[in-house]
Amino acid sequence: VQSFLEFEKPIAELENKIADLRGLSTTENDVNIDDEIATLTAKVETTLTQVYSDLSAWQKTQVARHAGRPHFSDYVSRLITDFTPLAGDRGFSDDQAIMGGLGRFRGQSVVIIGHEKGKDTNSRLHHNFGMARPEGYRKAVRLMDLADRYGLPVISLVDTSGAYPGVGAEERGQAEAIARSTAKCLDLKVPMISAIVGEGGSGGAIAIAAANRVIMLEHSVYAVISPEGCASILWHTADKAPEAAKQLKLTAQDLLSLSVIDKIISEPIGGAHRDPGTTIDSLGNAINDYLTDLSDIPGDELRQAREDKFLAMGAL
């Protein structure tokens, strides 16, 4: 069942009319409803194009959080063959908010890491809604160590509202784990490509996104804090989240203009949740192009270029 966001009400009404028409018996009174369905379907496409061509930062945040967007497991199943997952941090436990392993991407051996939010109530609880604990970032470091050791490119997929802020996570060194994972990204001597595929929230995102190339899906977001968190700090109310989203410059379009990211991947009309397969294939093509470009660059140069890239951000 398609779920609709608040600003998609005109689209929802049209979709509901189409569903009602399809539910009618076409034999009753010899009424042919195909033409009416075709007209409404065309109107849905037109309305989708109009609505999605002018989304606000807050609306893009809502799209980025849509439960129907492709998840890490979807990308792996469509893009990676011979996937072998790696579990645990060899210190405390196996965090399920960050998944990863080794596999083949279009014939090339790679290490892939990413946040997994889960798709239903049980899986979301299992994956802690994509909010990683320290063990998740330490698992990511293990995977990056393997990539460095065996000369394998790293692909990371970011989709998290932020690292888990619980007491236990803090007691086990959340800040240190995030810092160490970020440092490992910057120290790699193999190509690293990161993609923001949904939410990119704060240190929980950058910990696996300090890459040679950072790309974003068209309606994903990437910021130092959530709009609700920012609004609560600045205005002492989460009701100001739409204004905070605008001021945070968190959209892919804003971040490309600021040179924080390298490329925007177009989503199907109506967002990635309307056509996950096409979205995944488009992202795969972009990743493949960047891996090809970076494959012949020596490791020391990759490392230095990555460091220079991030040191240059914010420079006047």
Located regions from the model:
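Intrinsically disordered, low-complexity segments enriched in small/flexible residues
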Residues: 1-109, 277-316
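Terminal peptide-recognition signature
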Residues: 14, 56, 112, 159, ...
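Short, motif-level signal for alpha-helix interfacial/capping segments enriched in acidic residues
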Residues: 33-36, 136-137, 230
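Short hinge/gating elements
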Residues: 61-64, 125-129, 270-273
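Short active-site-adjacent helix-start/loop capping segments
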Residues: 70-72, 120-122, 164-166
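Glycine-rich beta-alpha loop segments
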Residues: 82, 92-94, 100, 105-157, ...
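Gly/Ser/Thr-rich beta-alpha loop segments that engage phosphate groups in nucleotides
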Residues: 109, 116, 132, 164, ...
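Conserved catalytic cores of soluble enzyme domains
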Residues: 158-288, 292
